[in-house]
């Protein structure tokens, strides 16, 4: 019995311990487990719901994708049809363009071929015409007839309004023109009382003064400087030259420095011009004007035909004495050289300062002509003119330009026939060679 009671008490103690300390954690654990199961069930339900929603959305997405696919397919079909239509239209346009371009290219090739044929035929025709013309003008009478025909055409020409200046005035401005005119007027007034020796001395002194002004640039600058009062310049001139030059020369130099010059070099040009006038006046007194003119023009043609000699005479870096010596040597071998013409040439070559010798000599010859109130006509012909033709030409040109004309003839066989005339800056080209050249130039490219 005691064992039973002991066991009962032990059982009661065990039950108490279980109830006191074991049951509460177990109950809490079970309750937590129930909550976990309940939460898992809720999550499962939520997941099932989401799955159902996902299936619905998937189905909707499939439906939308199908609809979009059908839409894209329809649009692609429409685009393909439109592109096909555009390509077809472009192909048609391109075909038309290529066709038109081909036709244009054919036309261009045809025109080019025609042009080439015309050029070839034209050139051949011009060459053949040149041969015929050369054969025709080989006869002197036929060649002379071409000059007569040109003169007949020239007679129909209206009077020219061109103003012809000499080289001395063409390069001057208004102030220098007036000053040069005053100096020339002064020369004409004092030169009438001088004999040949006096004019020679005047020319030499003026040329020496020109050389002095060339070498003494400060003096030239002072004397050529425009001033309202020229008295100081005149006094300086007299102080320097009164005992070195004649009264006539000093009087002319007073006039020169008293006037206004556009540039400093114009004063030297004016002094040189007056020195030339003195020698031309000497030729006039001696009755040698025609001879001097002819020899000046002839020497100008010599320089034109001998460019080496012209270049040596034009080389102003060489001392003037050397160039004048070369000129004297060139003139020595020529018979009948007029002394006045030689003096004019020596004076001109010695005072060159950048100009070409051949042009300076022609300017000098034209000055000699202009002193007689005439103008120079440089005439080129294939052969010498007869006296009748020269007279007729002189009369026609005198009528056209309203002044007596001095004809200077240059023979150039390359002209074939007709004449080429230059008066001042005006050119009248009636040569056969120029007409053949114009025909050649007029051929299509």
Swiss-Prot record:
Major localization class: membrane
Q: Which InterPro entries match?
A: ATP_synth_B-like_membr_sf, ATP_synth_b/b'su_bac/chlpt, ATPase_OSCP/dsu
Q: Mind listing the UniProt keywords for this protein, alphabetically? A: ATP synthesis, Cell membrane, CF(0), Hydrogen ion transport, Ion transport, Membrane, Multifunctional enzyme, Transmembrane, Transmembrane helix, Transport
What are the recorded GO MF terms, alphabetically?
proton-transporting ATP synthase activity, rotational mechanism
Q: Where is this region: ATP synthase subunit delta?
A: 169-445
Functional summary from the UniProt entry: F(1)F(0) ATP synthase produces ATP from ADP in the presence of a proton or sodium gradient. F-type ATPases consist of two structural domains, F(1) containing the extramembraneous catalytic core and F(0) containing the membrane proton channel, linked together by a central stalk and a peripheral stalk. During catalysis, ATP synthesis in the catalytic domain of F(1) is coupled via a rotary mechanism of the central stalk subunits to proton translocation. This fusion protein includes a component of the F(0) channel (subunit b) and of the F(1) subunit (subunit delta). Two copies of subunit b and one of delta together form the peripheral 'stator' stalk which links F(1) to F(0).
How does this chain assemble?
F-type ATPases have 2 components, F(1) - the catalytic core - and F(0) - the membrane proton channel. F(1) has five subunits: alpha(3), beta(3), gamma(1), delta(1), epsilon(1). F(0) has three main subunits: a(1), b(2) and c(10-14). The alpha and beta chains form an alternating ring which encloses part of the gamma chain. F(1) is attached to F(0) by a central stalk formed by the gamma and epsilon chains, while a peripheral stalk is formed by the delta and b chains.
- Name of this chain's protein: ATP synthase subunit b-delta
Q: Which species is the source of this protein? A: Mycolicibacterium smegmatis (strain ATCC 700084 / mc(2)155)
Taxon lineage: Bacteria, Bacillati, Actinomycetota, Actinomycetes, Mycobacteriales
User: In the UniProt record, what gene is named as encoding this protein?
Assistant: atpFH
